[in-house]
């Protein structure tokens, strides 16, 4: 049986999302197992946060106490233990955690994979198993193998989207046994801004009412209050595209309807994820808090859909 991100019967629209506790986070994703919530985000060994209610958060350590040895083969210049931009999915009884190994501003990168039977460290079966590399890029490639996101199409077939700058957002079909690229799978470019520096990254694809929605981040993160990150979205009837924005502009030609570009306090929102529970949905992302000198901070907000099926945030 396929599960995307199990949230049970939680009604996200009835919750108060005034988050509290340890909220430092960059590139967050969420999962829920039983009554407990988990956030995974960029940091030493992939950082983990946990919550009993989705609102009050505390740090819970990391996935990898030390980095897998194989990464040096792909990213020899990396000399610190920060792993980037995880994504997690639950498939056939196993949690699959994808993550990025790279150095800033280069496309010498690799996406790795770890698995676990449970997210609860109190469970005797709790153990993150290194499953090695998934896909990599080199300086001679026109894409950047970071920012992974796994999506299942309407037939239950898993796909991996990823990408940052270079030629933009990529998509490749996964093998259902290994959850790595299928033999002879074709690498597809599904979104590009069409001009240098092609500041698009962090894809996240969800399916709703017959449409695939591609959420991406435009412009520049990681500059604190000088960040220009913003969240954009397009949609397609086919997982491979073409994705178009609300005005019908192709995301292969710079299209993308802006969902959130921040405000005076919350600067540069981006690297988002979207989750459903019944008819309700949430948007999970980081933004830079101007009241805390640009500290990257976890945000979780209700995500609504208009009569034409386009997502929006409440004012």
Swiss-Prot record:
EC number: 3.2.1.99
Transmembrane listed as a keyword: no
Catalytic site: 27 (proton acceptor), 201 (proton donor)
A family per Pfam: Glyco_hydro_43
Keywords noted in UniProt: Calcium, Carbohydrate metabolism, Cytoplasm, Glycosidase, Hydrolase, Metal-binding
Pathway: Glycan metabolism; L-arabinan degradation
Cellular component aspect of the GO annotation: cytoplasm
Cofactor: Ca(2+)
PANTHER family xrefs: ARABINAN ENDO-1,5-ALPHA-L-ARABINOSIDASE, ARABINAN ENDO-1,5-ALPHA-L-ARABINOSIDASE A-RELATED
Protein name: Intracellular endo-alpha-(1->5)-L-arabinanase
